[in-house]
Amino acid sequence: MNAAFPSPSERRLQPAAACFEMERRIYPAEQDSWIMRTTEPSLPEQTGPPHNPGLKRLIEAKREWHHRPDAEAGEQGFLGWHERGYLPHFDAPNVTQFVTFLLRDAFPVTRRREWEPLLREGNESLRKRKLEAWLDRGHGECWLRRPDVAAQVEHVLRAEDGRTYRLRAWTLMPNHVHLVVDVWQTPLSSLLHLWKGRSSREANKGLKRRGTFWEREYFDTLIEDEVRLRRAVRYAENNPVKAGFVCDPKQWLWGSARFRDEYERLPSERTAGTFTRAAG
């Protein structure tokens, strides 16, 4: 067994191939964690991703073929595959996730005609690149450009690193955040609630403002092997380079790359091994 990742039987996950095949039949051309649809004729005014009318069928298929939380995980608050009206989410103990969450105005309603067509792109890889390019243009207030605000958010993200979860990588961009995180015994949705709640309170104080700081929805992708882990870490840490802010990831002041040693390890990984899980 690969020591870096728990086996599928340990996570109680069924092989995903059948689920993905079902997904292709139910939801053609929109098959990844960025799944969003915008074909409804009367969409409400909003800044975030539009409502996804086919989402419930997709989640039902994923639950049938891929994962259902056991009683113990359910008691801890893990939901397995679930949705909150816009995007599919996966939540289980002892897994690694790639997560992206945004400032509230990263997709401003005033420019909806520009960003909405990006969500209809049928090619998964191309859609991700287009969405990332949109975010990297820095729409909205971009409060994370301010060093004091970025420092507060990063402090909150790292506060429980190694105790409640383990961060494998992170990058704060002007209007969004990328994380690669080992989820242990606290549901990802609870971690996001914690991170967003604490950081928004501190950020709003510094900005002398009130109101919503973060977009409610987020994007998450389950990472199931070492190859995908390395790819996710590289993607997150290279985002400032791709956006043209720096020439080397280690030059970016609000990311994990600057903490890596000559073996590319973060401080929390130097004593923890390649993959660690909470006891139990």
Name every feature range the model reports, one short phrase each.
Residues M1-G280:
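Short catalytic/metal-binding and nucleic-acid-binding patches
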